């Protein structure tokens, strides 16, 4: 029987959700409506008694104080138009899943596989009479047609009947059908097989696969296990997933022919040469002070925290799915990187999340090309996805930022990070080490497998185009995942498994295939995998990226205890096969072999890409900019720029207090609304030792030179980290590259230049990580961040997020960015140069410029170490980094965050004498920090920084006003802090 429960607010109860929808429709679509009311709908398809449904409706599904509820009849007919939005068949419905569990508890029985609960939302409009307009509202504002469907009912019409046709159930039967694919065809046909199958395999890779399957020894081996010479769809899909750019990082592993003004050089793997090479050099220099435990070989990097605990950190990207479904893509991004942390070593407890987003302007007014969502819709969906992923998992989100550039309209960038801790030793063994053993059972825990996420790995290895698959979109379930994590930590502590990893890109194909490298093979029974619904073919079961799943190697003598504990904690665990030493990637379905690939071929057989690159410096020049007539107006304009303004409306949606460990929070100051440079987290309640996390990201400099963009991102991350108290003696970095396609082709005629940009960024990564003594412990690359449909192509600016994590010995010594007391002295550390290329000041005036900031690592490192000593001695009242907008913006932020003004004299800066006042104020020279110091500490501070660039430039004052004197002693800025703060808070206040 099918029931439809409708729940809505009683008369007189404010419908905040409906009012938000009305406002959004007005702002985004320009449609004025009288009012919007919302109802929650639960459609139940189960064998239940009427009383059971009534109890559910009046119990867990509604609040009788503020809500009305009806069963199988409309809640009201008082509307002009009704739009009901629900999920398409097969899309994860988290609320429906929770509702299903609630009813099961209520009636004390388990639903069958065919029974379920499906949720939807009704929007009831007053003042909407045009059905075409309603269709526009549904398709452009209320729903995402990729994952949702809707019905429209005009006032006076009857709602559709409640029957099987309204249930978004997946139809079809799971089948053992396996296709054989003939690869002995023309090159055009090989490319067609790759393209139509969404395999993202190149012609050379298709040739390699074809040649492998014509090898007589391979044919003989295949015949012995019941397979013919032709590749099966299961095998081809597994190869495509394993060889995808997303998983194999073929561009970073390529043989690069790089040409610049110094000549031609061959670089065998950017990753090995610059990233691994830098870390190897840093660790050698650290010698017995090396704190790295696990780098580049697990789901996340691991460093020491103290003698008893290890610290885990990873940052991922989830760009392509977020372009199609911002909410689901971002939610999957954060819960996915959570699994990376949990699945590192023998398993770690998650302590905090980070997030960094890159969007086009939410106020984008130009016409969008086909298949692109409006940047504001992406903004709102991504923020909500990360909010739900972190908040519902009980993990605080403590650090992040948002960058804006209209080139991110083609693909947004969604960086999600997570940190975790684990005991240094578990059962007498290092916790960061793990190894599956021959005979261990392959056990999958957590969620079930569905069509969601199929081809996610290969989809994210290409640009967004007409054929981008709907199935690549996933929606995570943080509650199911949290239950699984709690179970796994207990299983870890009981010693119930030998190894663990997450099911991310490529699903079982990736997780089991990678773990089997420990043993040399595996035997996987795909028909034993639990499914969300019928209708999946064997290859879909293998590569589905359905969320909330982990794969473990469980020894035979622990299997029963493991399965029993999982059942006790309401976590599904399935025995899918065994790890072997066979040398083969072996999958069966109903006892029949459907895939038998050499482990050596699937993991090492991909041909090395050949990547040509040629560096030609761009033709950029310095603009002839007149001195401002009103510096206060310019400063307010800069504070209101999207890349500088307050992101409080976003930050407030994240729980940064859960777990009670956040010491320095994302917002700080007298009113808790100033922008913190970094976050400080105390993970152990019996110790004052803390973790400091920060980041740097500078895409605006890429248009001039990606070498300096990378250097500035590293420096920005480190100075944010140091400003808050992070120790330069115990700090590690993570690099996350997001690039436009750098492979020369008809689609990318400027591939030589884009590849050279990539090389230069990697050169800087090596140079500055070695110079600063910062090892790289993990990272990721996303290399196809382009949109192309027809002749229209949008490529992102080359972007690298450089995340920094390390230690502060005593969180009580942490320093925040806000000024503290009138009378405190204001110092500027670091020299100010004429470096405004790519700056926010130039951007405000419509220019790019040429003088990109150049980082002097030698002086910066000395400065940062000295800042550490000053912090440890308690000499600094505040410390704030100078970044976008330079000194002017940093002064304003520190002042209005603390609630006190400043009197500043630009003549006191360490700068070229001829440097004009606007350039002194808005230069973005790197490695600079703004300090405030109590007068009694003046001598000590100046003694500490003796011989370095340390300028006393002013004082903190009682009056809430920023006053800046220019070169002739005349005040060029005298403006109330309230005006500056309002300019800074206004742009995104309502987002």
Set out the residue ranges of the language-model regions.
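Non-catalytic interaction/regulatory segments
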Residues: 19, 23, 51-64, 93, ...
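Acidic (E/D-rich), amphipathic helical modules within compact regulatory domains
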Residues: 20-78
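Short, solvent-exposed interaction modules
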Residues: 67-117
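Short glycine-/aliphatic-rich beta-strand segments at the starts of folded cytosolic domains
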Residues: 1-11, 38-43, 77-89, 119-123, ...
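Long, contiguous binding/interaction regions
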Residues: 2, 13-24, 923
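Short, surface-exposed ligand-recognition loops at beta-strand->loop->(often short) alpha-helix junctions
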Residues: 6-17, 48, 84-97, 127-130, ...
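Short beta-strand-to-loop capping motifs
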Residues: 7-9, 43-49, 85-87, 123-134, ...
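Glycine/proline-enriched, intrinsically flexible loops and inter-domain linkers
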Residues: 33, 90-92, 112-113, 124-126, ...
């Amino acid at each position: 029987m099918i029931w439809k429960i409708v729940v809505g607010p009683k008369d007189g109860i404010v419908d905040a959700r409906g009012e938000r929808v009305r406002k959004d429709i007005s702002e985004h679509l320009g449609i004025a409506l009288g009012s919007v009311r919302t109802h929650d709908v639960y459609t139940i398809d189960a064998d239940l008694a009427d009383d059971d449904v009534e109890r559910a409706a009046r119990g867990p599904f509604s609040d009788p104080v503020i809500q009305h509820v009806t069963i199988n009849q409309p809640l009201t007919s008082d509307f002009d138009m009704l739009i009901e939005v629900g999920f398409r068949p097969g899309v994860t419905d988290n609320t429906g899943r929770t509702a299903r569990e609630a009813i099961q508890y209520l009636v004390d029985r388990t639903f069958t596989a065919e029974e379920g609960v499906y949720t939807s939302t009704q929007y009831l409009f007053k003042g909407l009479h045009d059905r075409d307009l309603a269709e526009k509202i549904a398709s452009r504002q209320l729903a995402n047609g990729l994952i949702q469907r809707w019905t429209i009912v005009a006032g006076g019409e009857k709602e559709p009947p409640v029957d099987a046709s309204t249930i978004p159930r997946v139809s079809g039967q799971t089948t053992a059908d396996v296709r054989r694919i003939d690869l002995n065809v023309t090159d055009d046909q090989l490319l067609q097989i790759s393209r139509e199958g969404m395999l993202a395999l190149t012609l050379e890779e298709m040739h390699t696969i074809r040649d492998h399957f014509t090898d007589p020894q391979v044919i003989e081996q295949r015949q012995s296990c019941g397979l013919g010479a032709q590749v099966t769809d299961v095998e081809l899909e597994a190869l495509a997933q394993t060889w995808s750019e997303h998983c194999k990082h073929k561009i970073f592993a390529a043989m690069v022919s790089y040409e610049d003004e110094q000549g031609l050089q061959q670089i065998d793997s950017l990753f090995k040469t610059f990233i691994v090479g830098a870390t190897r050099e840093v660790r050698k220099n650290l010698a017995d002070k090396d704190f790295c435990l696990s780098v580049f070989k697990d789901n996340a990097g691991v460093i020491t925290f103290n003698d008893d605990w290890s610290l885990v950190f990873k940052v991922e990207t989830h760009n392509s799915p977020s372009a199609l479904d911002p909410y689901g893509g971002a939610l999957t991004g954060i819960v996915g990187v959570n699994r990376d942390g949990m699945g590192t070593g023998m398993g770690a407890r998650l302590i905090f999340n980070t997030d960094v987003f890159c969007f086009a302007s939410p106020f984008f007014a130009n016409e969008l090309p086909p298949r692109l969502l409006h940047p504001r819709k992406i903004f709102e969906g991504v923020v909500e996805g990360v909010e739900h992923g972190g908040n519902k998992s009980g993990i605080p989100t403590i650090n992040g930022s948002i960058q804006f550039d209209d080139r991110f309209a083609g693909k947004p960038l969604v960086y999600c990070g997570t940190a975790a801790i684990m005991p240094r030793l578990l059962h007498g063994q290092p916790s960061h080490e793990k190894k599956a053993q021959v005979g261990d059972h392959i056990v999958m825990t957590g969620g079930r497998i569905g069509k969601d996420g199929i081809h996610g790995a290969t989809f994210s290895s290409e640009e967004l185009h007409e054929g981008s698959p709907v199935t690549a979109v996933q929606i995570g379930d943080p509650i199911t995942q949290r239950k699984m994590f709690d179970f796994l930590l207990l299983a870890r502590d009981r010693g119930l498994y030998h190894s663990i990893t997450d099911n991310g890109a490529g699903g079982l194909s990736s997780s089991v295939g990678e773990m089997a490298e420990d043993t040399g093979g595996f035997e996987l029974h795909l028909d034993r995998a639990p499914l969300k619904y019928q209708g999946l073919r064997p290859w879909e079961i293998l590569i589905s990226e359905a969320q909330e799943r982990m794969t473990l190697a469980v020894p035979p003598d622990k299997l029963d205890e493991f399965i029993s504990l999982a059942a006790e904690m309401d976590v599904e665990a399935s025995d899918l096969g065994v790890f072997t030493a066979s040398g083969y990637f072996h999958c069966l379905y109903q006892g029949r072999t459907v895939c038998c690939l050499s482990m050596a071929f699937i993991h090492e057989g991909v041909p090395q890409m050949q990547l040509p690159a040629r560096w030609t410096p761009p033709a950029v020049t310095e603009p002839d900019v007149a001195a401002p007539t009103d510096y206060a107006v310019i400063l307010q304009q800069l504070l209101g720029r999207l890349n500088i303004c307050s992101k409080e409306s976003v930050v407030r949606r994240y729980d940064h207090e859960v777990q009670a460990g956040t010491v320095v929070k994302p917002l700080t100051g007298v009113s808790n609304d100033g922008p913190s440079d970094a976050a400080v987290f105390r993970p152990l309640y019996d110790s004052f030792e803390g973790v400091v996390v920060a980041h740097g990201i500078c895409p605006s400099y890429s248009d001039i030179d990606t070498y300096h963009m990378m250097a500035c991102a590293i420096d920005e991350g480190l100075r944010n980290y140091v400003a808050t108290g992070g120790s330069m003696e115990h700090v590690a970095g993570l690099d996350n590259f997001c690039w436009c396609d750098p492979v020369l082709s008809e689609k990318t005629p400027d591939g030589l230049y884009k590849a050279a940009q990539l090389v230069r960024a990697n050169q800087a990564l090596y140079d500055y990580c070695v110079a600063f003594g910062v090892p790289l412990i993990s990272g990721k690359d996303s290399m196809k961040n382009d949109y192309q449909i027809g002749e229209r192509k949008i490529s992102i600016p080359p972007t690298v997020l450089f995340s920094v994590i390390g230690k502060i010995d005593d969180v009580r010594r942490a320093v925040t960015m806000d000024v503290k007391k009138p009378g405190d002295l204001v110092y500027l550390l670091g020299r100010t140069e004429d470096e405004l290329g790519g700056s926010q000041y130039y951007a405000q005036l419509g220019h790019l410029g040429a003088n990109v900031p150049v980082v002097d690592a030698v002086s910066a490192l000395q400065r940062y170490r000295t800042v550490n000593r000053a912090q440890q001695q308690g000499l600094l009242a505040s410390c704030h980094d100078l970044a976008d907008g330079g000194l002017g913006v940093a002064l304003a932020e520190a002042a209005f965050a603390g609630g006190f003004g400043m009197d500043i004299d630009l003549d006191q800066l360490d700068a070229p004498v001829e440097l004009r006042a606007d350039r002194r104020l808005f230069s973005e020279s790197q490695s600079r920090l703004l300090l405030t110091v109590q007068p009694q500490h003046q001598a000590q501070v100046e003694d500490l920084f003796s011989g370095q660039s340390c300028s006393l430039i002013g004082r903190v004052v009682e009056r809430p006003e920023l006053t800046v004197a220019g070169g002739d002693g005349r005040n060029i800025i005298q403006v109330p802090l309230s005006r500056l703060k309002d300019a800074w808070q206004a742009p995104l206040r309502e987002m």
